[in-house]
């Protein structure tokens, strides 16, 4: 498992599916077994205690994302009047004292995937592309087949990232695969999320980013 300190208030975990299996879990356990999900979460927090100076006490905001080869988990300390309204109190040293409804909230809102058949028309798939440099973003803006993509360009920690959204009512799997294959000719798939970029990055070009880049460069 990899642990990365994003900033003073946010920690990112990345755990591969192979690592999950070595720890005695499988993907179905994590998504659908509440006790297994809870066990994995506390294992991660225990490991964090020894590797980073990050106290998980108090309200936390947790985001879990399923990637192709593993899970990415962001744990952010909530602040009063901010994310604290949506967070919940966690005390690492005594998880058994947590209220049952708080554990269920964690598992239901963050560890349970939404089934495709339950998705509404407004649901959107997200892809984050990391550019090696800005010239690659300019080159991508001139590529064909991407004219109607919903894109936003961010700068974050000295790098450029393109947030691409695929509304599920407009794109099927084949369309998405074709678009992603073109995108990957100009950059790399990033483990960052749209939330992280919106929260901590700087918007360089808002929607539609590629059209604006092509216009100005």
From Swiss-Prot:
<protein>
    <recommendedName>
        <fullName>Adapter protein MecA</fullName>
    </recommendedName>
</protein>
<dbReference type="GO" id="GO:0030674">
    <property type="term" value="F:protein-macromolecule adaptor activity"/>
</dbReference>
<dbReference type="InterPro" id="IPR038471">
    <property type="entry name" value="MecA_C_sf"/>
</dbReference>
<comment type="similarity">
    <text>Belongs to the MecA family.</text>
</comment>
<dbReference type="Pfam" id="PF05389">
    <property type="entry name" value="MecA"/>
</dbReference>
<comment type="subunit">
    <text>Homodimer.</text>
</comment>
<dbReference type="InterPro" id="IPR008681">
    <property type="entry name" value="Neg-reg_MecA"/>
</dbReference>
<comment type="function">
    <text>Enables the recognition and targeting of unfolded and aggregated proteins to the ClpC protease or to other proteins involved in proteolysis.</text>
</comment>
